[in-house]
Regions:
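Active-site metal-binding loops of divalent metal-dependent hydrolases
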Residues: 4-6, 45-46, 83-84, 118-120, ...
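Short, solvent-exposed loop/turn segments at secondary-structure boundaries
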Residues: 11-13, 51-56, 90-95, 155-158
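Short acidic, glycine-rich surface-loop motifs adjacent to enzyme active sites
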Residues: 72-88
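Conserved beta-sheet core of the metallophosphoesterase superfamily
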Residues: 93-170
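A general structural motif
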Residues: 73-76, 112, 173
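Active-site-proximal beta-strand elements of phosphoester/diester hydrolases
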Residues: 37-47, 78-82, 142-149
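A short C-terminal boundary segment appended to hydrolase-like catalytic domains
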Residues: 168-213
Length: 213
């Protein structure tokens, strides 16, 4: 997927041929992969006139819906874009993709189960219901994952490191393993498990004070 550093800095190429070099290497800015048990739809969120901010159009979201609706019922549905849907609290100045709430709501409605992004160079993973108010039909699990940067950390950027996520999808569960680069190789630093599919919200039943046992 193209990021904001994958387009020319020079004028007029930035506006007249922004994707030429990227497409020369990768063929398209909005890839689609339909494999055995998984459908991955890429969304180009980069806008040449804004270096940092990202945007997804209604036409792009409609295409995601079409691809997911054509996918087999059992397939894991994954949407990928560069700009993040949520950010680490310590990177609060990095704004998420424009109209984040509407974009995420559209992806959820289309059937997305996993939404992947990057941009902020730091790892964050959450289940959608952790930061959005539950609505009718909101019992379906959707995981939002922001991948760490794979390349060398930028100078004078504290808290950044090389890292990657590995996703392992089972029938009712998604396992996310986070690896960080150490001097002697990759080290596993976290394993997180999230529900897949429809799972009603669970509330703990607490005994009232003074209730006889």
């Amino acid at each position: 997927m193209p990021g904001n550093h994958d387009i020319p800095y020079t004028f007029p190429a930035r506006f007249t041929r922004p994707w030429a070099e990227f497409e020369r290497h990768w063929g398209t800015t909005q890839p689609l992969h339909a494999g055995d048990g998984v459908v991955v739809v890429g969304l180009n969120s980069v806008r040449p006139w804004r270096h940092q901010s990202g945007k997804v159009t209604s036409q792009q979201l409609a295409a995601v819906t079409e691809h997911f609706h054509r996918a087999p019922p059992h397939a894991l549905r994954v949407a990928v874009l560069h700009h993040h849907m949520l950010g680490a609290p310590w990177r609060s100045k990095k704004k998420p993709v424009k109209d984040r709430n509407a974009v995420l709501a559209s992806l959820v409605a289309s059937g997305a189960q996993l939404v992947l992004a990057g941009h902020i160079h730091q790892s964050t993973i959450a289940e959608r219901r952790e930061f959005e108010i539950a609505t009718p039909g909101g019992e379906r699990a959707v995981i939002v994952s922001i991948a760490p940067a794979l390349g060398r950390p930028r100078p004078n950027r504290h808290g950044e490191t090389r890292g990657l996520h590995v996703y392992d999808a089972a029938e009712n569960e998604l396992t996310v393993r986070t690896y960080m680069w150490r001097e002697d190789g990759w080290g596993l630093i976290a394993v997180r498990r999230f529900p897949l599919g429809v799972e009603p919200l669970a509330f703990e039943q607490r005994e009232r004070a003074g209730t006889a046992s």
